[in-house]
Amino acid sequence: MQVFREKQLLIQAIQKVKSDGKSIGLVPTMGALHEGHLSLVTNALKDSDQVIVSIFVNPTQFDNPEDLEKYPRNLNKDIELLEKETSDIWVFSPTANELYGDKILSQNFDFEGLESVMEGEFRAGHFNGVGTVVKHLFEVITPDKAFFGEKDFQQLQIIRKLIEKTGLPVEIVGCPILREDSGLARSSRNERLSFQNRKEAAFIYEVLQNANRLFGTESAEHTTNWVENQFKNNQHLKLEYFEIADSETLKKVNKKEKGKQYRAFIAAYSDGIRLIDNIALNN
């Protein structure tokens, strides 16, 4: 498996692949890889001649320095996990200065309001940081396709908007959420949960499934109130937000409209660890 730390060496290798008429698939990650990431890699391998996995803990998307410091990092373990899939993958793991240059700054984007709701409401500047690093990665790697998980659905829509705004020739592929047997969405943060916390956190997906059923016959307001009450009665999890939104615009739904696609989004804390999830709603 080839591991690139310098972007110039990677660019040269990519030019060789592209000159042979082969396609590049990118799976951008912040490391701490798990089965969810591997499912993205599997999708990329089916759809691309050469797959590149970027492993980079991006400082510009953290609004909380403590969160950045605590984010799990183990490059050797990540590489071992990828090698079990295939040794044909390339890994790009630069330092912040290698990727950004001397000034590690976040760029401001106009995401037309997609960035100001839900996650954006609670994490100031987060999506500008995401947009900045993804734009840098796309410019260095020039992928034909990039693969993102639907667990971060808001991020997925923002990346699609980034492509629309910048005109970068990258096809964005959304991949289904991978879940643990309990239903808990796979996440790097799950590593920080105790065995008991992990069991208790399965409640999040259970509530989402019930909200989906309820939304089939009830209003968005009624469904939201029901979810909030479920968390008021739960001693182990603290709800940060639950929102039903239009799948495309991410605008909060007040009244259901026929033919529209909706999604429920949730963020909750388990013993101080923030977990997010979402589900497509039947209308």
From Swiss-Prot:
Which reaction is this enzyme known to catalyze?
(R)-pantoate + beta-alanine + ATP = (R)-pantothenate + AMP + diphosphate + H(+)
* GO molecular-function term, one example from the UniProt record: pantoate-beta-alanine ligase activity
Task: Identify the InterPro entries for this entry.
Answer: Cyt_trans-like, Pantoate_ligase, Pantoate_ligase_C, Rossmann-like_a/b/a_fold
Which residues does the annotation say bind beta-alanine? 61
Task: Provide the Gene Ontology terms for cellular component.
Answer: cytosol
Please list the residues that bind ATP: 30-37, 149-152, 178, 186-189
Q: Does the keyword Cytoplasm apply?
A: yes
This protein's UniProt keywords = ATP-binding, Cytoplasm, Ligase, Nucleotide-binding, Pantothenate biosynthesis
What does the record give as the active site? 37 (proton donor)
Q: Which GO terms describe its biological process?
A: pantothenate biosynthetic process
Q: Cellular location of this protein?
A: Cytoplasm
In short, the EC number is 6.3.2.1
> Where does this protein hold (R)-pantoate?
61, 155
Pathway(s) this gene product operates in, as recorded in its UniProt entry:
Cofactor biosynthesis; (R)-pantothenate biosynthesis; (R)-pantothenate from (R)-pantoate and beta-alanine: step 1/1
Pfam families assigned to the protein according to its UniProt record, in alphabetical order: Pantoate_ligase
Q: What is its main location?
A: cytoplasm
From which residue to which does any coiled coil extend? none
Listed under subunit, the entry gives: Homodimer.
Q: Which PANTHER family match?
A: CYTIDYLATE KINASE/PANTOATE-BETA-ALANINE LIGASE, PANTOATE--BETA-ALANINE LIGASE
Family (UniProt)? Belongs to the pantothenate synthetase family.
Further information: The reaction proceeds by a bi uni uni bi ping pong mechanism.
- What does the function comment of this entry state? Catalyzes the condensation of pantoate with beta-alanine in an ATP-dependent reaction via a pantoyl-adenylate intermediate.
What is this protein's record name?
Pantothenate synthetase
The record's gene field reads panC
